């Protein structure tokens, strides 16, 4: 898949008309879905589930405050989702929804009216831009809404979305549940435009549920104007050091007097850091008492700043659902609502994953297979990565077997140590070699170092998205120790929660022919020594390889399950290839793009590869699942859970291979999948749905069809015999035939004898 610097969507969406029809359908069974939602006692002020508030609609995908963004929010969220509108006033006193006082920040106004930029004092700061109060509503219809955050996709900027009045939004959506945010009442008052007068007028035709503002005087003006059944007033806190413009007090000082806030508001809206602050390294520190204090004062607490495509605390492992749960279901308190650019994720967190323990009933059955353990949280293939994968709920942990020069099989993702080890080049630069059979560039390969040397190395966490400045768990970037295959198998035996282990074997032919190392036999011997071949453990063993010859060799010598990995991205698989695979494999691994192909990170459709393999009784496992939003197609809303749902509930795969086992394991306990009516925020995506609502001029380039996988791609000659290799000594290290540590697999006796007799002949 093409990596991208931002965000995605879900659901069956084909056109604007279908979007509107979907809104009607949501209303038809909203009551039924609401009745099915969790009735657990929430620690909110009133005991109800936290509200999901869609900031500008679904602004994480579509331009903020566009009709399409509001429609998509209603389609993919809880039935009572509240739609947020940043209220601005035009020159002719009409109210529009727009996210910023400067219209140029999320529209094309600067291209249409390049000479109408002006300067104003906004809260005492001279600000240049294009301001709503300088344009009539008619003039505002001459330019288009576009993304306001440049890191997000620009593919919907050409869809022709216009600025909407509040009445437009209400009429189009035909629903209640609106939150009007008045960010700059004092500014508009200086321009002789009255927010309070407009709100009183529009409230006669529009149902307003919430009104928020960061200005105290605004609330003092409108208090008592709406009557008993009027909207809920919510005071918005900005940065603690920022000054509230009408009292000249910092928001931090106002926070210390919540009883004062209670005199004019029923709730507060605060940034996430007010409740769960971070330290300088982006890790969580203990939560504040703000929620409990506000609830004691009778104030509801709403939290802003939620988006799937921004950096979050490292504690969440790039999983936005985990972040929401830390605010709504942490055992100490629940906030009363969350303001999100991605309301689908907030909806799922609140309704599908809250109040679910680790022992909750599983609603769906598939294998969670680790990739080098929990390698998104710790250096891969270390003891800590494997232990966390088991703790996080992996069904199967994996070991990519490499061989040391002294014949010890151990776990490491790559045969080139530089890909997994810190500061390796400085220590063993003299071991760098060129091996065209393995890599087009020189490397420091595992078979060039002894096992004691490898044990002395410092592992390094992988950072596959470094180019986007997205890093993994820096505090633990070098934690843990590498372990041998024997240690890996011993670890797996001690956990009854594991159903199996997956052992990956690659480069077997090269190791036999050029290094005199028989990785197949080394794996078999180690399994026997660990008790996996004689029935002393019930843990299932799966052997994986991209080489059919390797799996054929294992099949001849053992009864372990074999898994054939198809490296290529394929669009179809021929019957003859499937029949050939069935001769030596019990299951197949394919990559994500072989299920859902994409163009420029937009799904283009779905292949029949999974269906064809499963019809031939071959389970299908898919890799590689990661939590970082840049690893996912836009269609998945920058949410790893939405992606998993598409592959499990949508494509019906049999297992996920993931660097973040916790996210996949939690999905199994997804409460919403056990309901008679699955809610819209847990329906699988429609592959290609986003392309169908994209302007033809904005479509990504068409991709050539992925290849068919044929029998010739499967068939390989048998593995060559092991070639005896004369022992060599590395500088300052023991001979490569030195005895392996106790408990580790040694070189086969036959190989040692061959080397001995060869040396006699050379004398």
Curated annotation (Swiss-Prot):
Fetch the InterPro entries from UniProt: GP_PDE_dom (IPR030395), PLC-like_Pdiesterase_TIM-brl (IPR017946)
Biological process terms from the Gene Ontology for this record are: glycerol metabolic process; lipid metabolic process
Keywords, comma-separated and alphabetical:
Cell membrane, Glycerol metabolism, Glycoprotein, Hydrolase, Membrane, Repeat, Signal, Transmembrane, Transmembrane helix
Q: Which Pfam families match?
A: GDPD (PF03009)
Catalytic activity, reaction form: a sn-glycero-3-phosphodiester + H2O = an alcohol + sn-glycerol 3-phosphate + H(+)
Intracellular or extracellular location(s): Cell membrane
Q: How does the record say this protein sits in the membrane?
A: Single-pass type I membrane protein
Q: Which cofactor does it need?
A: Ca(2+)
Glycan-modified residues: 105, 192, 248, 257, 315, 359, 430, 534, 547, 654
Name the Enzyme Commission number(s) assigned to this protein.
3.1.4.46
What is the enzyme's class at the highest EC level?
A: hydrolase
Cleavable signal peptide: 1-35
**Positions of the GP-PDE domain:** 50-350, 366-668
Report the protein's function. Answer: Hydrolyzes glycerolphosphoglycerol, glycerophosphocholine and glycerophosphoethanolamine in vitro.
By sequence similarity, the record places it as follows:
Belongs to the glycerophosphoryl diester phosphodiesterase family.
Q: What is this protein called?
A: Glycerophosphodiester phosphodiesterase GDPDL1
């Amino acid at each position: 898949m093409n990596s991208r610097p931002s965000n995605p969507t879900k659901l069956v969406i084909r056109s604007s008309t279908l979007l509107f029809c979907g809104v009607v359908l949501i209303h038809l069974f909203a009551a039924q879905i609401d009745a099915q939602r969790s009735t657990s006692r929430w620690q909110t002020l009133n005991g109800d589930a936290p509200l999901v508030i869609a900031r500008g609609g679904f602004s994480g995908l579509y331009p903020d405050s566009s009709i399409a963004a509001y429609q998509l929010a209603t389609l993919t969220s809880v039935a009572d989702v509240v739609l947020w509108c940043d209220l601005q006033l035009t020159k002719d006193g009409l109210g529009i929804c727009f996210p910023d006082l400067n219209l140029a920040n999320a529209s094309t106004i600067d291209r249409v009216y390049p000479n109408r930029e002006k300067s104003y004092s906004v809260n005492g700061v001279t600000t240049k831009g294009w301001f709503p109060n300088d344009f009539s509503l008619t003039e505002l219809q001459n330019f288009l809404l576009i993304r306001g955050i440049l890191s997000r996709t620009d593919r919907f900027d050409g869809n022709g979305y216009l600025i909407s009045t509040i009445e437009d939004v209400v009429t189009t959506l035909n629903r209640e549940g609106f939150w009007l945010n008045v960010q700059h009442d004092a500014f508009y008052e200086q321009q002789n435009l009255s927010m309070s007068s407009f709100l009183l007028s529009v409230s006669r035709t529009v149902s307003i549920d919430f009104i928020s503002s960061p200005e105290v005087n605004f609330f003092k003006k409108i208090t008592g104007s709406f009557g008993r059944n009027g909207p809920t007033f919510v005071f918005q806190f900005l940065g603690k050091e920022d000054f509230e413009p009408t009292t000249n007090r910092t928001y931090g000082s106002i926070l210390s007097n919540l009883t004062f806030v209670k005199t004019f508001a029923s709730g507060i809206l605060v940034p996430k850091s007010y409740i769960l602050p971070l330290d300088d390294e982006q890790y969580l520190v203990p939560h504040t008492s703000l929620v409990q204090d506000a609830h004691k004062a009778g104030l509801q607490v709403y939290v802003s700043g939620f988006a799937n495509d921004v950096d979050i605390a490292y504690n969440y492992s790039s999983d936005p659902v985990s972040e929401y749960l830390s605010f709504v279901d942490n055992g100490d308190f629940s906030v009363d609502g969350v303001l999100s650019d991605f309301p689908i994720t907030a909806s799922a967190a609140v309704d599908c994953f809250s109040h679910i323990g680790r022992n909750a009933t599983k609603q769906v059955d598939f294998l969670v297979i680790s990739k080098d353990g929990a390698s998104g949280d710790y250096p891969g293939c270390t003891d800590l990565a494997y232990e966390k994968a088991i703790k996080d709920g992996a069904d199967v942990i994996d070991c990519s077997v490499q061989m040391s020069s002294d014949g010890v099989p151990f776990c490491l993702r790559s045969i080139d140590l530089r890909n997994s080890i810190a500061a390796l080049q400085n220590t063993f630069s003299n071991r760098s070699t060129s091996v065209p059979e393995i890599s087009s560039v020189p490397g420091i390969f595992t078979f060039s170092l002894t096992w004691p040397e490898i044990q002395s190395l410092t592992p390094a966490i992988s950072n596959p998205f470094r180019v986007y400045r997205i890093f993994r768990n820096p505090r633990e970037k070098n934690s843990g120790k590498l372990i041998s295959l024997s240690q890996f198998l011993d670890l797996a035996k001690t956990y009854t929660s594991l159903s199996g282990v997956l052992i990956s074997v690659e480069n077997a032919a090269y190791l036999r022919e050029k290094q005199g190392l028989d990785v197949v036999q080394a794996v078999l011997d180690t399994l026997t020594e660990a008790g996996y071949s004689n029935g002393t453990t019930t843990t299932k063993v799966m052997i994986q390889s991209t080489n059919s010859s390797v799996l054929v060799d294992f099949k001849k010598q053992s009864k372990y399950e074999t898994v054939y990995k198809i490296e290529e991205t394929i669009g179809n698989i021929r019957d003859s290839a499937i029949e050939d695979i069935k001769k030596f494999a019990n299951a197949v691994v394919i990559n994500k793009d072989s299920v859902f192909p994409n163009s420029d990170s937009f799904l283009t459709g779905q292949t029949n590869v999974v269906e064809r393999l499963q019809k031939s009784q071959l389970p299908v496992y898919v890799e590689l699942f990661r939590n970082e939003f840049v690893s996912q197609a836009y269609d998945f809303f920058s949410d790893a859970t939405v992606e998993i749902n598409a592959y499990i509930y949508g494509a019906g795969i049999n297992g996920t291979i993931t660097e973040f086992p916790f996210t996949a394991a939690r999905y199994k306990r997804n409460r919403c999948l056990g309901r008679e009516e699955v809610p819209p925020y847990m329906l699988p995506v429609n592959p290609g749905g986003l392309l169908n609502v994209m302007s033809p001029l904005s479509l990504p380039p068409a991709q050539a069809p992925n290849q068919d996988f044929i029998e010739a791609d499967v068939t390989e000659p048998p593995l060559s015999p092991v070639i005896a290799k004369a022992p060599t000594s590395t500088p300052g290290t023991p001979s490569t035939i030195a005895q392996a540590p106790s408990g580790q697999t040694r070189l086969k006796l036959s190989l040692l004898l061959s080397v001995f007799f060869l040396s006699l002949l050379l004398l």
